[in-house]
Regions:
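A short beta-strand structural signal in non-transmembrane regions
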Residues: 55-61, 141-142, 205-241, 249-250
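Hydrophobic, regular-secondary-structure patches
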Residues: 26-104, 109-110, 120-131, 143-144, ...
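N-terminal Sec/SRP start-transfer signal
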Residues: 1-32, 44, 48, 320, ...
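Conserved transmembrane alpha-helices of multi-pass membrane proteins
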Residues: 337, 350-382, 394-400
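Transmembrane alpha-helical interface segments in multi-pass membrane proteins
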Residues: 279, 292-346, 367, 371, ...
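Hydrophobic secondary-structure segments that place a key small or acidic residue at a functional site
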Residues: 87-88, 97-107, 118-203
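Hydrophobic alpha-helical transmembrane segments of multi-pass inner-membrane transport and secretion
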Residues: 15-42, 262-301, 324-331, 375-378
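Peri-transmembrane interface segments
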Residues: 38, 42-45, 222, 227-284, ...
């Protein structure tokens, strides 16, 4: 502890070099924290969905395939099913914003039974059921867009050739890890609009867009099961029922369904870990070069220290501690700073519904800090060994 002032003064001896080393460390770690947090959040959302006992049915050929709306009623009648709802992605524009938030066409009667972690006031839910053009939005979406009950919410069709002129009838809330930026509107209203486009295109003699011909498509079916142990058998039963139909299905748990999106991006886990390793290697070179230059400038000073009685071990300790101090400051700014930044700045509204929330957990922040300390230790080890074993005579020759 008595050498801390000396170590601190050495770290400040070349302020430009120290600041650049700290800045490079903090920026690299800040970006690495974002990548690790993104992977952790995707995994966390998938794992937390286990407790809700839900399975998801989609077309066996992927999202491009159709799931007839009639399947929802048939699945609802199966043993072990609490409720089922269509969950059809709309993907419209709001005030010319492309993909501003997630939008789904659902069954007003069952959606909040299936998604029972979401809560909405009974009178608002009743208004949603009674008004065909009504919608229920998340509390965070209402806050972001300054929407309230009775406000219009026009969505311009992008994937579909129809516009949804909605009215906010309810605002739902939910757990901290739930998506509270969704817009849920009635499937029957959406389907009727698609049918009108199909009919008008056919009567006019023109070819209707492919999406307009897909009225009656549930997209996916979210199914609430009574217990978790029946989910595998129930999923198999659903798939067996439609195996030989024109629209075979694939049913999986909500956890597997959520992880499927990450799998669509490729081997995301390996890519993120590879980038993280590259960041660590780059930091080793940056910090190592900075410490090597610092030790070359202090050859005479190290020789004087050893001449007045400083042991090799003490010289080694002083150099290593300086390297760890510089890297640790960069790590604190980058890793802990990212934690504080994303705790106060919510970037989820700018992800178009892809991420319901974003934060850097303490585990990831501490991991980043540990990485910076390792970088400091590893980058300072070689210069410290050279300094500890340097010749006093050769060092003092440079004294003028």
């Amino acid at each position: 502890m008595k050498y801390f002032r000396y170590i601190f003064r050495n770290a400040r001896r070349n302020p430009v070099r120290s600041v650049l080393t700290i800045a490079s460390t903090s920026i690299c770690l800040f970006l690495m924290m974002i990548l690790l947090a993104f992977f952790a959040i995707n995994n966390e959302v998938a794992v937390e969905s286990r407790i809700y006992n839900r399975i998801v049915t989609m077309n066996a050929n992927g999202f491009a395939g159709m799931v007839p709306i009639a399947f929802v009623g048939e699945v609802s009648k199966m043993d072990g099913v609490v409720a089922a709802t269509p969950f059809s992605w709309f993907g419209g524009k709001y005030h010319d914003e492309v993909m501003p938030f997630s939008q789904f066409a659902v069954d007003a009667e069952t959606i909040f039974t299936v998604m029972d972690e979401l809560t909405v006031a009974p009178d608002q839910l009743e208004a949603f059921k009674e008004n065909k053009d009504g919608c229920v939005i998340g509390s965070k979406l209402a806050r972001d867009r300054q929407l309230k009950l009775g406000d219009p919410l026009p969505l311009k069709g992008d994937l579909y050739p129809v516009d949804m002129n909605l009215t906010v009838r309810g605002i739902y809330s939910g757990p901290a890890r739930a998506d509270q930026r969704m817009c849920l509107f009635r499937f029957d209203y959406f389907d009727e609009a698609l049918k009108r486009v199909t009919m008008s295109s056919a009567s006019g003699g023109s070819l209707a867009p492919a999406s307009a011909k897909r009225s009656g498509n549930a997209g996916t079916i979210f199914i609430k099961c009574k217990t978790a142990d029946i989910m595998p058998s129930l999923g198999k039963k659903i798939d067996d029922l439609y195996r030989n139909s024109d629209f075979p299905t694939r049913t999986q748990t909500e956890e597997a369904f959520s992880k499927m999106f990450a799998d669509m991006l490729g081997d995301l886990k390996s890519a993120i870990y590879g980038i993280g390793l590259a960041v660590v290697v780059a930091l080793l070179f940056v910090a190592g070069n900075a410490m090597a230059m610092a030790m070359r400038e202090r050859t005479t000073e190290v020789a004087v220290l050893k001449a007045i009685g400083f042991s090799k071990g003490l010289v080694l300790f002083l150099v290593l501690t300086e390297a760890v101090l510089v890297a640790g400051v960069g790590g604190a700014i980058g890793a802990l700073g990212s934690k504080a930044f994303f705790d106060y700045v919510d970037i989820a509204p700018y992800t178009g519904g892809f991420l319901p929330f974003f934060y850097v957990s303490w585990n990831i922040a501490i991991l980043g800090l540990c990485v910076s300390l390792f970088v400091g230790l590893a980058s300072g080890l070689f210069p410290a060994i050279l300094a500890a074993n340097s010749s006093v005579i050769n060092g003092l020759r440079k004294v003028v």
